[in-house]
Swiss-Prot record:
GO terms for cellular component: ESCRT II complex. The keyword Transport applies. The keyword Glycosyltransferase does not apply. It is found in: Cytoplasm. This is Vacuolar protein-sorting-associated protein 25. It comes from the Eukaryota. It comes from Xenopus laevis (African clawed frog). Component of the ESCRT-II complex (endosomal sorting complex required for transport II), which is required for multivesicular body (MVB) formation and sorting of endosomal cargo proteins into MVBs. The MVB pathway mediates delivery of transmembrane proteins into the lumen of the lysosome for degradation. The ESCRT-II complex is probably involved in the recruitment of the ESCRT-III complex.
Length: 174
């Protein structure tokens, strides 16, 4: 199933940030929702600023409109303020997009563990995000950095413990 673009995406003024404060806030909210929905649909976690600016997300070739780099940065800053984005490098060119925050991913993973009677079991990180048992689960294919943050959130709640097994990491659920 393809991504369903919101109506604003085909409205040329959407690609120019508006000067009116109220209008701009609504526009940034719409852009934030669009970015999170698009990343969720396409299972995107780690992204590059230049690549995303050229992607269909900010570049509608059908109406020949593209959000400027400066405006893309404003949208990304809005997402950062809401806790949905974190810069990976100092020059703000790569970022982690969090359409689910780590604690939310932790809950999803823990529900799967509980539902399948796997508490008191040890998993490698690979098994959780790439194993046959998790095929079809929403967290299958999750970025490893995001998985670790999710498991750290569960560790804070005493529901899991991250362990090192030889050269790889694993997790035990309680």
């Amino acid at each position: 199933m393809g991504f369903e673009w919101p109506w604003q995406y085909n409205f040329p003024p959407f690609f120019t940030l508006q000067p009116n404060v109220d209008t701009r806030q609504k526009q940034l909210s719409a852009w934030s929702s669009l970015v999170l929905s698009y990343c969720r649909q396409n299972k995107l976690y780690t992204m590059n600023l230049m690549e995303i600016q050229e992607s269909p997300l900010f570049n509608n070739k059908k109406i020949q409109r593209k959000l400027s780099l400066e405006s893309v940065q404003v949208v990304l800053e809005e997402l950062r303020k809401k806790g949905n984005l974190e810069w990976i490098d100092k020059n703000k060119s790569r970022f982690l997009i969090m359409w689910r925050r780590p604690d939310e991913w932790g809950k999803v993973i823990y529900q799967w563990v509980s539902k399948n009677g796997m508490t008191n079991s040890v998993f490698t990180l690979y098994e959780l995000i790439s194993g046959d048992d998790t095929e079809g689960e929403e967290f299958h294919g999750l970025d490893e950095a995001m998985l670790l943050r999710s498991l750290e959130a569960l560790q804070q709640e005493h529901k899991a413990e991250i362990i090192t097994l030889n050269e790889s990491r694993g997790v035990k659920f309680f």
